[in-house]
Amino acid sequence: MAALPRQGIIILTYVLAALELTCLFMQFSILPYLSRTLGLDSVSFGYLQTTFGVLQLLGGPVFGRFADQCGARAALSLSFLAASALYLLLVASCSPALPGVFLLFASRIPSALMHTLPAAQMVITDLTAPTERPAALGRLGLCFGIGIIFGSLLGGTLNTAYGIQCPAILAFVVTLLGAVLSFTCVPATTKEASVQSAPQGGTKASVFDLKAITRLLLLPRVLPVFLVKVISGLPSGLFLVMFSIISMDFFQLEAAQAGYLMSFFGILQMMIQGLVIGRLSTHFPEEALLRSSVLVFAVVGLGMALMSSVLHFCFLMPGLVFSLCTLNVVTDSMLTKAVSASDTGTMLGLSASVQPLTRTLGPTLGGLLYRSYGVPIFGHVQLMVNLLVLLVLWKKPLSQKGEKAR
């Protein structure tokens, strides 16, 4: 097959990311019903979610190094094959003749290698100029929004019409198709020849070289940005992890109403990350956008501390989505610019591990805060944490740190 042009590879990468995220949210939409069918209580379901988060957390940085060393084709193919294995085990767990609970927990194991979004980010980073990078990475938000909307919609509709196995079977077929497209259409590597030939003078580092991963994280231009990403986004991440419970208990929403709210969230994410951030990045420096996301986080936190109905939350949601999208896109762009082109995959793998970290801590820490203090505590924590981060960014700008590091 003839090699695709650069723009064709970028478009294919967006399509592959949208397919994988749609399948992922199809899985999320049926997982609570499947676990209930298999007799799992809420505690066991929490263990299932935590297992998924821990495996993604551990696998992210290692997968990033694999992508740097083996190339985009191998990384995307491996991610889709791992996803296919997960959905196949999920299909098997639906069968009454098989040990469903064991297979359901076993289906979490391949998730350690399911990192299509970081692999797609690496491809986009390698194929775009630094000035174009925020807008190009922002367009992946369209893929995420498509995944939320169509994945949730297809999962619920197919589950109701054809049974709980149907979404898992469809996801298995689609991810197999994604693996075939990755293997046949994506180039072996998207990095420049000079970057590929750089490590030939010495021994090739191992994919599991934790020292190299740690060294990358501790670079002077990397660690401050990474800490801002983790600390600023953690309070809202805890709220979103607990949102399914909050929507039932605090907002008193039915399942269908909660689905509409998530669709609204997905549409906002598509619009803001796909259309707004790219335009803002051409007019404002990245550090100004980062400060604005932290400031809006603080304002939204104040609103969350005072809200009493779902209508109030709907008014706050655009600000929340803007902050989340801007924080993720801008920090990813800054982190990839802070490392050499040969390390972008590892860096994006580290960055992608932030969300699994929140998913791992969220059920325990978020549940404790919610039971002890109620919904307003999430707003108070978000307000105080982001005001502190904003103060630090104001006193010690990241650009000054970068200049000193050079």
From Swiss-Prot:
SUPFAM superfamilies: MFS general substrate transporter (SSF103473). Expressed at high levels in fetal and adult kidney and liver, and extraembryonic membranes (yolk sac). Expressed at moderate levels in intestine, heart, lung and testis. The chain crosses the membrane at residues 8-28, 43-63, 85-105, 140-160, 168-188, 226-246, 258-278, 295-315, 316-336, 374-394. Pfam families: MFS_1 (PF07690). It comes from the Eukaryota. Disruption phenotype: Deficient mice show decreased hepatic triglyceride content under refeeding conditions following fasting. Its main location: membrane. Keywords: Cell membrane, Ion transport, Membrane, Symport, Transmembrane, Transmembrane helix, Transport. GO terms for cellular component: apical plasma membrane; plasma membrane. One of its GO terms (biological process) is monoatomic anion transport. InterPro entries: MFS, MFS_dom, MFS_trans_sf, Tet-R_TetA/multi-R_MdtG-like. GO terms for molecular function: organic anion transmembrane transporter activity; symporter activity. It is found in: Apical cell membrane. Belongs to the major facilitator (TC 2.A.1) superfamily. Organic cation transporter (TC 2.A.1.19) family. May act as a transporter of organic cations based on a proton efflux antiport mechanism. May play a role in the transport of chloroquine and quinidine-related compounds in kidney. Plays a role in the regulation of lipid metabolism. This is Solute carrier family 22 member 18. It comes from Mus musculus (Mouse).
